[in-house]
């Protein structure tokens, strides 16, 4: 909006990333980046200057910070599981700080959807839970939520409900670290970073081995697309007008995957006319006369050794590519 942003200090919870900065840099050096310059430059420079991660967000929808603090601020509890939370609630009831357990009926250890449908771990429920400190003082949850980027960074383990289920998937490295991920170059401060930080801090490991950092799709003048500037291209209108094939071919033939693309619909029209138009005319010519002559392809397949050098070369290139993809 180009409006000035007002900053003011708030109490927040941080992850002390700066203590592990050297480890973050060391693990990054083991990652195969495409292009390499993104890993060493943009992402590497970001790690070199990494600050502590502000985890607190003052919102309603999201994952609540599982932190309870006594009224005088002298005691803190961090809850690590539903099982622990239920135990703490029962203790709070015993101490007279709560009347009942809202998770009554939940079966600890039962990982079925039906069982988890019995509880709600979001803010409007969790904020009503009052725990007891070791000295029986009332403890209330921190009102903030967790940064949503922490959710995405925890994806490799959260998707398997680790460590409560499927521990072997992660501990035995069956599904972690990832062999390959891909995202836009802007994720050097987003998903690439949060995956990397959590993997390093929690598992002392990379979260991914190989990464392709895609370039951004810009307008035809090289400016970032924006509704405010009115230079955004509607992808659905583009696909309806030119079709998906011409659009795909234009995008993959005009820049490397890791370079930014200056997107111009006039270029799609040119691709459709010159490439797909020519291809269509060739096929139409063949189809017309093949049907007139009732052509049938019953010719015997020529053995590889009997083919010309150019045929053998292109077949070899194809099978080399197939092998490299399968072995990757």
Language model features with spans:
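Membrane-interfacial helix termini and the short, flexible loops that connect transmembrane helices
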Residues: 218, 257, 262-265, 297-304
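Generic structural signal for alpha-helix starts
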Residues: 35-36, 177, 304, 308
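Short, flexible helix-adjacent loops and helix caps
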Residues: 161-162, 259, 291, 295-298, ...
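Short, mixed-charge aromatic SLiMs
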Residues: 215-223, 274-275, 301-312
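Alpha-helical recognition segments enriched in aromatics with Gly/Pro capping
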Residues: 59-61, 69, 88-92, 96, ...
């Amino acid at each position: 909006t180009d409006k000035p942003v007002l900053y003011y200090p708030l109490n927040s919870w941080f992850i002390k990333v700066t203590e592990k900065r050297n480890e973050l840099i060391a693990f990054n050096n083991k990652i195969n980046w495409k292009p390499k310059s993104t890993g060493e430059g943009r992402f590497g420079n970001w790690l070199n200057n990494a600050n502590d991660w502000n985890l607190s967000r003052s919102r309603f929808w999201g994952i609540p910070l599982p932190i309870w603090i006594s009224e005088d601020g002298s005691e803190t509890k961090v809850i690590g599981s539903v099982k622990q939370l239920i135990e703490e609630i029962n203790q709070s009831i015993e101490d007279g700080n709560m009347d009942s357990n809202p998770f009554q009926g939940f079966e600890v250890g039962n990982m079925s959807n039906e069982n988890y449908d019995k509880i709600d771990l979001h803010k409007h429920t969790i904020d009503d839970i009052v725990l007891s400190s070791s000295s029986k003082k009332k403890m209330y949850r921190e009102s903030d939520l967790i940064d949503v980027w922490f959710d995405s960074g925890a994806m490799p383990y959260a998707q398997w409900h680790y460590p409560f289920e499927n521990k072997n998937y992660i501990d035995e490295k069956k599904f972690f670290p990832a062999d390959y991920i891909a995202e836009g170059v802007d994720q050097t401060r987003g998903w690439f970073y949060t995956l990397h930080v959590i993997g390093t801090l929690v598992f002392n490991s990379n979260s991914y081995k190989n990464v392709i950092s895609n370039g951004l799709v810009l307008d035809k003048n090289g400016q970032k697309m924006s509704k405010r500037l009115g230079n955004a291209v509607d992808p659905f209108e583009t696909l309806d007008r030119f079709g998906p094939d011409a659009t795909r071919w234009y995008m993959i033939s005009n820049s490397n995957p890791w370079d930014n693309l200056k997107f111009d619909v006039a270029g799609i029209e040119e691709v459709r006319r010159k490439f797909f138009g020519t291809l269509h005319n060739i096929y139409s010519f063949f189809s017309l006369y093949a049907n007139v002559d009732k052509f049938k392809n019953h010719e015997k397949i020529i053995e590889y050794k009997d083919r010309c050098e150019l045929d053998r070369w292109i077949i070899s290139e194809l099978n080399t590519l197939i092998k490299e993809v399968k072995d990757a």
